[in-house]
Amino acid sequence: MKNYFLAAVLIVSFLVPGMGSSQTREDIHLQKDCKYCGMDREKFDFSRMMIDYDDGTSVAVCSIHCAAVDLANNIDKTPKAIKVGDFSTKDLIDAESATWVIGGNKPGVMSKRGKWAFAKKDEAENFIKSNGGTLADFEAAMKAAYEDMYSDTKMIRDKRKATRMKMQEHKH
């Protein structure tokens, strides 16, 4: 009897974390591509964001860059919840209570300057030891996203233009 109980405890301890992960990534299956840039949110699960508004609408994006675009475009809506992919676990966490890292040597998603969220401050500090950057809160990360918006948008346009030109060259 003791062995059955121990086996049951072991099975549950292995199954429960796995079940939690599939539930926290359900947002990806509901909205696979970013509303603004079309990028695959599953590929960018470590930076993806979800914004739930008080009117019952929600938006799924690939990054804080695209979240900033949505928040600016929906100035008359009030966000009820803003979630972001934890850089370490890829699970959605509350963006406003997360510890953020701005900058460092790892380029951002849709941005030259990275902006990464962590549920645990010590994981953010470990990231900084390996990659550089500075600790920040959500407000500072969002401010950085808006500050970077012009140069990032210009960079994205230039990259897409170069891609289109390469595609045209290959057609001829």
For the regions a protein language model found, what residue spans apply to each?
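Positively charged n-region of N-terminal signal peptides that target proteins for export
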Residues: 1-4
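Intrinsically disordered, low-complexity terminal tails/loops enriched in metal-binding residues
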Residues: 17-172
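Bacterial N-terminal signal peptides
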Residues: 7-15
